[in-house]
Amino acid sequence: MDQDIKTVIQYPVGATEFDIPFDYLSRKFVRVSLVSDDNRRLLSNITEYRYVSKTRVKLLVETTGFDRVEIRRFTSASERIVDFSDGSVLRASDLNVSQIQSAHIAEEARDAALMAMPQDDAGNLDARNRRIVRLAPGIAGTDAVNKDQLDTTLGEAGGILSDMKDLEGEIHDYIEKFADDTALVRGVAWVYNLGSADGGETVITINKSTRTYAVPYIEVNGSRQEVGYHYSFDLETQQITLATPLKAGDFVMVMTTESQLPVETLLASSVGAASIGTATGETVEERLTRLYGHFVHPETYGAVGDGITDDRVALQRSLDVAYENALNGTGPSTVRWSGDYMVSLNPNSLGVSGELAAGRSALCIRPGVSIEGKGTVRLDPSFTGSQSGAVITNWAGPADDCSIKDIRIYGGKDVATGTGITGILILDSQRVVISDVKVLNSTAGGIYLRKGATEGLYGCSFSKVSGCTVDNAGYIGIQMERPYDNTVIGNTINRCEDNGIDVFGNVNDATVTGIAQSTLITGNNIRDVLNGVFIESCGNTNITGNYIADFRSSGVIYNRINSAANDNSLTSNVLIGASGASAGVSFKNSVGYCTVASNRIQNSDYGIRCVGGGITGLNILPNTMKNIAKTLLFVEARNNGLVKSRMSTQFYEGAQVGGIPSNTSPRGVPHRFPSRLSYIVDIQPFWATEQGTREDNFERAKGTLASITGWGSKCALYDTIVAGDTVVSLNSSSVAVGEYLEINAEVYKVTSVSATYAVVRKWTGSDYTAGDYAAVIISNPSYIIRRVQWGEQ
């Protein structure tokens, strides 16, 4: 009988590296344990030992209390390395691996049987010079006795054993249960039909009191049969289906794997998760470690997550632990919020001058910390007051490399008694990422990246707000103060009482362009706000590809407080106003140097609006406009309202009716801010899709004054038809009172008309004055008629 143990080896302690003398298919089939006569400890790979090479391991733990190191191969009988499917290609290498796995299982089963208590060649149980421990006292005459029984018997007999009874045993099973190193799974040999088959059987039912979980192999008359080739095993029916029927008298031994403990007890134990495999080949315990070992969970620190209990302290603790880990490199720096957490304002939160009032914020994020998960943070609506604060902020200082992803924040608007609490406010930080966050019902702003109290020109730098939703905010949706290389992309902003997106860079004591660099605002969907995007006293922004609808004032506005809003670009946006909206684009208070191109502007009084004077350097390339109630390009009635600018031909969907919408505000009106558009302003007429005159600068009509025979073949008379006034050869069917005539580069105002003439008075520098102008209105000059609005707007 072969007594060579091949799959288990023990070494004395003292060294740190030990050889693996057997081959194996996977490292998870190799178990390293520390053992002694009365104790055993199974070690974990990576944390308690590691592989130096394929055939050598190194211990990483102390061996105190143990005298041996055991290395054992334990190949899974249920987790196949190779799984064959119908129709697949059969490769020799796969067959070899499958065959090796079966062979390994068989070797391990044989070794386990030998190590448990095998039979010798005479059929006797052989303890192999080892103690049999935990032996119950014998009862029947053929039972073995333990040492206590023997000592008692010897004592009662005065220490003299006069007679020894021969121990006789009858073996009823082919082999007893044997244990692996976890003492949970037992391999048992079972003999079919008392060792003699009836003949013809193709199905064998294992009828044992304990449940069989696998059949690694069977032997028929000593010939080994492999699972998957010679037979299959059904766990539910406990039946073995044979490929070849048995013959009468065949001796069939079945090697089974069964549980000593109930499955429920096994799975509920500390090693239960490690006993369950997954489709990826890892155990449930390994999967949980991989998923949750990378996160800090507030539930660890007492968070309830029911949306009612105040979890602020637990959430803050999770943030603090993540920061300590990030700082020391000792653990996960990502916090996973997956519950529904109520948080109150922290009375100990610090204030930041001009940004946060003390005691008005809930949670503080620190550098290197990430927040993610599908969780919800609800601000306790019982707060009062109106001072500024935030649900999540960084009152302790810059929070470089922080991120907030995929959570919801409810601010309590419409139910809270207080106001002023923004959803997220990050100050003076670099590489901030806020993505897929929903800020709902904020009593102030949604998501802010701002300049705090620290030194330096800029607020947050190299940062991004993407894929977020801000809905029903009491103030601004997304705001950046003094940004540097920041991006706002793909966000949805709805129902803000102020601006959808706001960029602020004012410098109080400067008149140059405000502070902002490389700001990209793109792909955002903004609806039902006061202004869609507000660029306040700063430049270097690129606003492109946004959809802005239902704004109440302007789709995009550029404004100066102290420093200018220059050097900007506005392209390819859709700007659709709500009823009564002022303008698609507004420029206010000496700003400019902006390219406006390829935008769709719709449903507002003005397409582009310039107010406050000094609007400079606008490059208005073709845009599409529709439903503009008054003017495509409005310039406020003041000198130098728009200078050094140009407007290309605009595409207007619709018709101009009665000169409305006008192409621009009146240009060149001598009596009303003649330099309203000045210093090289080039304006091209617009183009309309519907029939109409497509007037430019309120030019209603033009022609040549006709000579009248009754006037001596003249086209103008003085003091003849109307005393003290000049009349021209136009009548009430061609010109109206209040309209203006341009004749020979002079401007005249029509003061009255009849069926045969029109009375005109000339602009003389201070007023339209009656006088003799017939002497210069000669030789049938050409004329231009401009509408009344030309002189009044």
Curated annotation (Swiss-Prot):
Its main location: virion. It is found in: Virion. It comes from the Viruses. GO terms for cellular component: virus tail. The keyword Transmembrane helix does not apply. Optimum pH is 6.0. Pfam families: Beta_helix, Phage_T7_tail. Disulfide bonds: none annotated. SUPFAM superfamilies: Adhesin YadA, collagen-binding domain (SSF101967), Pectin lyase-like (SSF51126). Keywords: Degradation of host capsule during virus entry, Degradation of host cell envelope components during virus entry, Host-virus interaction, Viral attachment to host adhesion receptor, Viral attachment to host cell, Viral tail protein, Virion, Virus entry into host cell. GO terms for biological process: adhesion receptor-mediated virion attachment to host cell; symbiont entry into host cell via disruption of host cell envelope; symbiont entry into host cell via disruption of host cell glycocalyx. InterPro entries: Beta_helix (IPR039448), Para_beta_helix_rpt-2 (IPR022441), PbH1 (IPR006626), Pectin_lyas_fold (IPR012334), Pectin_lyase_fold/virulence (IPR011050), Phage_T7_tail_fibre-like_N (IPR005604), Serralysin-like_metalloprot_C (IPR011049). The keyword Transferase does not apply. Optimum temperature is 25 degrees Celsius. Functions as a receptor binding protein (RBP) and probably mediates the attachment to the host capsular exopolysaccharides. Displays a depolymerase activity that specifically degrades the K47-type polysaccharides of Klebsiella pneumoniae capsule, which allows the phage to reach the host cell membrane and bind the entry receptor. Homotrimer. The N-terminus anchors the RBP to the virion. The central part and C-terminus probably binds and degrades the host exopolysaccharides. In the N-terminal section; belongs to the Teseptimavirus fiber family. This is Depolymerase, capsule K47-specific.
